[in-house]
Amino acid sequence: MDPRSEVLLRQAELFQGSLLLVGLPADDLLGKLPDARGWCWHAGDQAALDARFEGRVDFGVEAPEAAFEAAVLFLPKARDLTDYLLNALASRLAGRELFLVGEKRGGIEAAAKQLSPFGRARKLDSARHCQLWQVTVENAPQAVTLESLARPYQIDLQDGPLTVVSLPGVFSHGRLDRGSALLLENIDKLPSGNLLDFGCGTGVLGAAVKRRYPHNDVIMLDVDAFATASSRLTLAANGLQAQVLTGDGIDAAPMGLNTILSNPPFHVGVHTDYMATENLLRKARQHLKSGGELRLVANNFLRYQPLIEEHVGQCEVRAQGSGFKIYSAKRS
């Protein structure tokens, strides 16, 4: 069981009744708290939880409509996402209890200060390298909309400026990361047809490709509902249309692709996790048509080239700079 869940269960008497577990891990916590419900935005966690606790977990970027008497937020990595979620919960919990749990290395001590606008926060427990904090919501805020927290910015591309709309919790919120910048300089001569932007994030790559190659069918896929919501806003801001999917890795992608384009993630919360990218490299061949291309950007220190050559085909480095490389391989 996740150590954060273990800390909650040390105080199980506090968590009886109508409780909302927000950003919960895919463990057995719901089994231990039979009256609780979950809310998550990670498609993999949602699938795992729904398989075991069908109908008890809501998915998406908005708090579920069903009433709850208390809520526990599992601290996310991004401070601005924490602010959004705490506001959404506290606005529904006037006079009731809001809890925050997280790992010490994830910044729970500092994050606990984000409870102070709602009342006097106190630490209830510290164990398993985690902390549990609680506040009685004395100052319930007005709920803010997610879109009001968006950070739009423009990037200059070969065919003109592109507007990117970034939401809290999305990778490189409010700015273009160096890996994507390098990949955007190298989206020439892509195969025509169906293109997948894998790990789409803000949607900057998929939107740029759709505008440059308007006759291509672009599919944008991410495991995170905040990312796919951001991608939809980016498309709308540029008057573009594409299919946007929230799903758990390459297994959620369609078959028969001509191109897979990606700046793949390698972090889950505060943890490094290469599994999604390695799974992409192992299975990309199954999703690509013969002659289809995998083109991705990765940090120099990540040794993806041997894996690409083993599972996709001969791999070349198309470009490199700023600590990143662009890899390209065509399915034979």
Curated annotation (Swiss-Prot):
It catalyses: guanosine(1207) in 16S rRNA + S-adenosyl-L-methionine = N(2)-methylguanosine(1207) in 16S rRNA + S-adenosyl-L-homocysteine + H(+). It holds the Pfam family MTS_N. It is an enzyme of class 2 (transferase). It is found in: Cytoplasm. Its main location: cytoplasm. Keywords: Cytoplasm, Methyltransferase, rRNA processing, S-adenosyl-L-methionine, Transferase. One of its GO terms (cellular component) is cytoplasm. One of its GO terms (molecular function) is 16S rRNA (guanine(1207)-N(2))-methyltransferase activity. Its EC number is 2.1.1.172. Belongs to the methyltransferase superfamily. RsmC family. Specifically methylates the guanine in position 1207 of 16S rRNA in the 30S particle. Monomer. This is Ribosomal RNA small subunit methyltransferase C. It comes from Pseudomonas savastanoi pv. phaseolicola (strain 1448A / Race 6). The gene is rsmC.
